[in-house]
Swiss-Prot record:
Disulfides per UniProt: none
Primary localisation category: virion
Other notes: Expressed late in infection.
Family: Belongs to the baculoviridae E56 family.
Name of the gene encoding the protein in the UniProt record: ODVP6E
Taxonomy of the source species: Viruses, Viruses incertae sedis, Naldaviricetes, Lefavirales, Baculoviridae
One Pfam family here: Baculo_E56
GO CC list: membrane; viral envelope; virion membrane
Function: Structural protein that is specific for occlusion-derived virus (ODV) envelopes but not of budded virus (BV).
Protein name, as recorded: Occlusion-derived virus envelope protein E56
Location(s), subcellular: Virion membrane
Annotated InterPro entries: Baculo_ODV-E56
Coiled-coil positions: none
Originating organism: Choristoneura fumiferana nuclear polyhedrosis virus (CfMNPV)
Entry superkingdom: Viruses
Keyword Transmembrane helix: yes
Amino acid sequence: MSTFFTNLRRVNKVYPNQATFLTDNTRLLTTTPAGFTNVLRAPSTRNLGNGRFEPGYNLSNNQFVSAGDINRITRGNDVPRIRNVFQGISDPQIGSLNQLRRADNVPDAGLHVKRTRSDAVKQNFPETNVRSADGVDRALQQNPRLNTYLQGAKTAGVGVLLAGGAYLTFSAATLVQDIIQALNNTGGSYYVRGADGGDTADACLLLSRTCQRDPNMNTSDVVICNHDPLIADTAQLQAICSGFNYQQEQTVCRQSDPAADPDSPQFVDVSDLLPGQTIMCIEPYNLGDLIGDLGLDHLLGEDGLVGKSSNSSDSVSNKLMPLIWLIGAVLFLGLIIYLIYRFVIKGGAGAAGAARAPPVIVLPPPPTQQTYNSTKQQI
């Protein structure tokens, strides 16, 4: 049975002419859910030259969006970008894609959540953007709840599978060494197959598409693909990384990104893969990526800061001392100003007033009044 994501996957390729794309897009429209047809009804192509055309769609602002990008944002449930492309789409219409993804075991949404979470960790907690042993150790000390949790996992000896098919195992002498080993085993091109409605995924490393591996990668701790899902010819596979230059390409993979520019070495035509499968490039992890992958971001931040403040009272006092001195100086200055006003300015004004006052002449009272006043004063 033809499905939306099956037909959308079929147009994620380079076409020899525009007419063929229009035919495939007509089939796609028959399975397109409400809210998405307004864009997919406006097919267009970008001429790449040499009889090659990139399929895509013209938006209302005349902007071209490629079929690869449409695949990426809908498969990955990238809601902000979905709203940006499909103007006026409603929440229920976006939610309708969930069931369609589950029907085809599309794993991209879960992988997108991990990437988004990892990016947020690295942005909000820059101390986790490290790969060295010293950097990892400092980050753990700054986040004691995370440290405590991972130390407990190490004591239990429970290994964890990461998104890229590598494992965080607890077999080294220290937790920091365990983490460094896991980081060394990440990075490369991965063949991913969704299962359980896309909630889980099996991933393996495609060595021929991984053009730069960590020199300390232990392949025995990484799930390696026993075949390439698209290419069977050995010579063709060996040629993928020919002339690779990381400084220019800024990625460790080639032919591993279905949404890349078709003229770049990173583009891969996955139109022949089932919708529940994909090829993707994962750059080497740092600690922030690892935390996001494992969903441990809730162990960062506030509690770690509280722990630091309670265990480092001297540090807190040192930070507050300049403020205390400033407040004291302001109060002292205010006291000086008050004293000057009270005894100099106000006192001087009183003396001047006394000098200017007219003389007072006191007349002696009658004798009877004097006796009365004297008696009254004694009472």
